[in-house]
Amino acid sequence: MQLNFKKSGTGPPLVILHGLFGSLDNWFSIAKELVDHYTLYLVDQRNHGDSPHSNEWNYGVMVEDLRELLDAEGLDSVFLMGHSMGGKTVMNFAVQYPERVRKLIVGDIAPRYYPIHHQVILEGLNALDLSQLQSRKEADDLLAPYIPELGIRQFLLKSLGRDANGFAWKINLPVITQHIEEVGKALDEGTVFEGPTLFLGGANSSYIQENDLLDMKRHFPNCTWISIPNAGHWLHAEQPQAVVTEMRRFLG
C-alpha cells in the first residue's frame, strides 16, 4: 500500500509513525524542532489520515506498508520512531528487518499484550450520525457524554474531515472497530532487535510499567527507558520540548 507521508528537512532519515486514531499532523510541532538535523518522514498509517483504507489491518501488513515506503524512497536504513500503535509497528518492523533500522525510538508502549481499552471511544465515534451533523461543535457536544476529556475529543475530531458532501471520517472507523483487538497484540515470542533502542514513556501514563522492563530487555537487549516528567500517554503533545531533547540526545 502506498502510504501518505510528508518529507522535510536535511540530514539522516528519521521516519515517524503516529498512534491509533491519529495522523502525521500530530507530529508537526516535533518536526519543526528536528528539520535542521534530519530528513523527516511523517507517515499516515493505513486506515488513518490521508492514507488508503483497507479491510486488512494488523501489524503484519503495517510493517510491509512501511517497508514499501522505505523501498520507494530508496532508504536502506533509517532512524525509526513510533508512538503507541505506531510504536508497535516500528517494534515489529525492527525485529523483522533489523538491518534497516539504525536506531529505534518507541513512544509510550511496551512489547506486551494490551487488553482492549478503547470501547467507550469507539462507542462515541460510532454513535455520531455524520449525515445529520451540522458542525464540528455539534460533533464535540455529542461526543462529550462518552469522552469527557476535551483534549481527547479535540484529538479525535482532527480525523473528522469535511467536503462539499458533508462530514466523513479520515480513519476507517468500521475496520478499526471490527479489528480493535489487533492493536494490543504482543510482539511474537523470541523476536529480537539488538540495535540501540529508546523507550520514551510518560511519567503520568500507565502504558509502560516497571514490570515491563524485563520484556523490553528480552526483545530489545540494547534498550534504555526514559520517563518524561509531567507527561501522560500523548507525551509529544504534552511535553514536546522534553521529547525533542531526548530524541536528539539519543539519535545524535
Regions found by a protein language model. Give the residues of each.
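Alpha/beta-hydrolase fold catalytic core
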Residues: 1-15, 35-38, 75-76, 178-181, ...
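Conserved HGGG/HGGXW glycine-rich cap/lid loop of the alpha/beta-hydrolase fold
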Residues: 4-52
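Conserved acidic catalytic loop of the alpha/beta-hydrolase fold
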Residues: 61-78
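Gly/Ala-rich beta-loop-alpha elbow adjacent to hydrolase catalytic centers
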Residues: 82, 86, 90
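Conserved serine/cysteine hydrolase catalytic core
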Residues: 165-219, 227
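Catalytic active-site module of serine/aspartate enzymes centered on a nucleophile-bearing elbow/loop
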Residues: 223-252
